[in-house]
Amino acid sequence: MPLARYAVYRGGPQIWVAPTADDSDGWLASMRHIAIESGAFVVTVPQFIPSDAFPDDFPVPLPPDKQVFGRGGAAVIEPSSGEVIAGPLYNGEGIVVADCDLRRGLHAKRWFDSVGHYSREDALARETANLTEPAE
């Protein structure tokens, strides 16, 4: 994924939206890293899935003692420091709101330019496939 992220970073995103099924603490740490690395606000939206969200005729038996299958963890992360500025919202439905001053992202990109001089294109060669052609 680092090369895929690098390709997106080159476009200069200001807000990175990351939906996922991963509700682990490791995911939140990853999103904090991506905020700093990309210089973009990160809005992460892990799934909150209570057991009553499944229909009675769901084809796979669910463990009767498990009440939540995805605890959520929606959060907004600031790009300069990786600080969580809203959320995380666990174990319930809700709306996570943050005031995102996009100038902070521009400042973060000037401080840590992951696709500029830090990327060292003079020292590293990379090649990406032309995705408009069918795979062989």
Spans of features found by a protein language model:
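CN hydrolase (nitrilase-like) catalytic-core segments centered on the catalytic cysteine
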Residues: M1-V96
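Cysteine/selenocysteine-centered motifs that mediate thiol-based redox chemistry or coordinate metal-sulfur cofactors
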Residues: G105-E136
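A short, polar/charged loop-to-alpha-helix boundary motif
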Residues: G92-W111
